[in-house]
Amino acid sequence: MEGNEKAEQKNATSEESTDIFENPGEGLEKATFAAGCFWGIEEAFRQVKGVVATAVGYSGGHFEKPTYEQVCTLDTGHAEAVRVIFDPKVVSYKNLLDVFWKIHDPTTKNRQGPDVGKQYRSVIFYHNEEQKAAALASKEELEKAGVFKNPIVTEIVPVSEFYMAEDYHQQYFEKKGFLQNILRSFKK
């Protein structure tokens, strides 16, 4: 993403922008994905042209307003997730799905690399029936093409409550100076 575009992205920790994650506004849509540790996943989506805001948080569990420490105990059922606000005139939901499939291993259950636990599971949380259909179709397409050696274990489920993670997790790689080119193939 070019510098100007990145500067215009909303920051999940600024007070005036936190509402965008629940009510994106006219012409914008939201998507929610879980694919391992949310720090790298968020950074990958932040690099996509058309993504106007990202936030990391917890979704898919049964515990209200969990903390990072609670999610890590495996007792809450939440996955580390990323809420993505995007402009569908610039980037389609299908394009976001393509990013999702490429930035993690959707064939490992409750694990991504060295991170092990239910909070690291692969999940597409759909916000409407169109997203559900697109997610199911993209998964089926990958399975038919034999892209992965092992079966895809990604859950495709309706979005549940998204609880914003603590401020120190938001844009973690940027704050720590670990900006990565996770998506070199997705750059213009």
UniProtKB/Swiss-Prot annotation:
Transmembrane segment boundaries: none
Annotated region described as Disordered, given as residue ranges: 1-25
Protein name listed in UniProt: Peptide methionine sulfoxide reductase MsrA
GO MF annotation terms: L-methionine-(S)-S-oxide reductase activity; peptide-methionine (S)-S-oxide reductase activity
Entry keyword annotation includes Oxidoreductase: yes
Record's catalysed reaction(s): L-methionyl-[protein] + [thioredoxin]-disulfide + H2O = L-methionyl-(S)-S-oxide-[protein] + [thioredoxin]-dithiol; [thioredoxin]-disulfide + L-methionine + H2O = L-methionine (S)-S-oxide + [thioredoxin]-dithiol
Position of the signal peptide: none
Species whose genome carries this gene: Methanosarcina acetivorans (strain ATCC 35395 / DSM 2834 / JCM 12185 / C2A)
EC code(s) of this entry: 1.8.4.11
Function, in words: Has an important function as a repair enzyme for proteins that have been inactivated by oxidation. Catalyzes the reversible oxidation-reduction of methionine sulfoxide in proteins to methionine.
Keyword Oxidoreductase (UniProt): yes
Stored Gene3D superfamilies: Peptide methionine sulphoxide reductase MsrA
Family as reported in the entry's similarity comment: Belongs to the MsrA Met sulfoxide reductase family.
Top-level EC class as recorded in UniProt: oxidoreductase
GO CC term, one of those recorded: cytoplasm
